[in-house]
Amino acid sequence: MGNQTDRDSVPSAGVSFMSARRVAVLYGGISEERAVSLVSGQQVVAALREAGYEVTPVEVGADLRDTIAALTPAPDVVFNALHGRFGEDGAIQGVLDWLGIPYTHSGVRASAIAMDKAAARTAFLAAGLPVAEGRLVTVEELAEQDPLPRPFVIKPANEGSAVGVHILHEGDNRRTEIARRWSFGGQALVEEYIPGRELTVGVLNDRALTVTDIRPRSAFYDYESKYAEGGSRHILPAQMHPDAFKRALDVALAAHHALGCRGATRSDFRYDDTRGEPGRLVLLEVNTQPGLTPTSLLPEQAALMGMDFVSLCRWMVEQATCRA
């Protein structure tokens, strides 16, 4: 069965704790994931204050000028606790590079590619990583006919937290209605549906942490399952064939590097073991801004490896950088 990696594999800090004292925490934002970011931000603010930093919470809204004003004078580091559009897609990263302020998590390019699921899929294919069959389709194409054999998944190309995701099985007649109500741009990403289990692997720079087996209370690991208390059960380390366990760690690390990520990421997988073990492992996406809420997966994995939440947040601050 699967085993966690050694505790001494958790990466050490890149710079000294004393080199950064003043930290601004960006949270909230303008995406569909604003509510999640508000919770993440509050958790991070409390943790960094406990760690001894001077913390300025900055609730981000629609006016960029307000955010820039809140970062003047510049802090030593910006902790990016935003999720979704503007916070996770390279936009705020570009602003912070322009301002010359070091920030946590990935830079502009990696963030932009990871947020664009079709672009990320292309990068994963180029790196030889296992992905589901799929393609981009226009909303008009989706309305006219099934783009893939059923069952298949419809998802926005640029959203996270399972926002806007639909699974269509045989006999499900919602396709036309989904296309009519689609509010995520003129295209959708459709992929074959992979049966089996939902897995995730956290990565801190050059180390994959462990594999979590996610058991949602509902049939689908949706937004409610991700963030509601009791919405899902997390089994870590995942109980699975050791070869598949190691493969998940290796693919997560390779995906992190394929996109050029830095700091913390979390790779999500489907694992089809319906025909026995070892099963088929399929990479879904890399999250460059993993959730930091009380039910979030990355903090759980870090804790299993001996890194509590305060230490995890401190580590993220110590890894902060920019391209200015």
What residue spans do the PLM features occupy?
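Hydrophobic beta-strand scaffold residues
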Residues: 55, 102-103, 131, 152, ...
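Short beta-strand-to-turn element immediately C-terminal to the catalytic PLP-Schiff-base lysine
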Residues: 137, 165-171, 202-205, 272, ...
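ATP-dependent carboxylate activation and anion-phosphoryl transfer catalytic cores
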Residues: 2-3, 14, 125, 242-324
